[in-house]
Amino acid sequence: MKAIPLSYIARNLWVRRVTTLLTAGGMALVVFVFATVLMMGEGIRATLVATGQPDNVLLLRKGAGAEINSGIERAKAAMVESLDGIATDGEGRRLVSKEPVVLINLPKRSNGKPSNVTVRGTSALGLELRPQVRVIEGRMFRPGTSEIIAGRSVASGFRGAALGETLRFAQRDWVVVGVFDSDKTAFDSEIWGDAEQMMAAFRRPVYSTLVLRLNQREALAGLKAAIEADPRLQLDVKPETQFYAEQSEALATFIRILGLSLSVIFSIGAIVGAMITMFAAVAQRVGEIGTLRALGFRRGAVLVAFLAESLLLSLVGGVVGLAAASGMQAVDIS
């Protein structure tokens, strides 16, 4: 069977370039939305999973699910700190960081609208447990003072959070003495200060979470068994990487479902639009089809030519959509 040349098909698309552009644009929109949503979901998952350290263990009140919902009394924290399997630093101190975690509202620099920001009380041990966190501007806060350090994203995105500025929350003024970078993990969106000062300011008598480092990864099972065997503790014990992976799963799944739903809706519109376009193209080209038949091309060859036009339109739309989606890598979403 004699085939219609591809050059003929390409010229036809160019002659009808307005229709071609609109049809390919609809397909590009579908690909762009679907690819962008997948990128967002994967970005959230990767950011939160990278927040944890493989040797760290995170403890919450049993059933709390999240740090801001948890509460661990000082006595329980002291009991955990005395258990076997916990690593020590060069000075012999046990690597356990006892941290209160709360949410506050701060106005954004861009529009002044309030948004949630996580405030974490910690200490020098907390910084040692998280080697990816580095103070890149200013200095570390001093224990026992109303000094704070802000994550890179908070410092650039919220009013009053830049180096040298003052924030007011929990009925107290806090001076930003440093800005830290956590290598694109969730800590970039937090404010850190002295744990005891945070608890006093927010009037919280309990910690939200305990973060500790194991002296060896195999010690996790023994530590978990010891905590579960003591009915006074009532704590959930999880590897830090597992905790943040679980935290990301719900949001990432929601974004994927939302993106898939939008993509299906847009896909239906794009398919209907492409069908209408191709039917109209066929109806307008009855004479052309007759000429092709008169030149000796069979029905199958004509059908293949029209199908090739549709595939070429889809290919162009897909490439444009992916190219546009790849540009979203340069966009930071808060």
Task: Enumerate the predicted regions with their spans.
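Hydrophobic alpha-helical transmembrane segments of multi-pass inner-membrane transport and secretion
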Residues: R17-I44, A252-E288, L311-V320
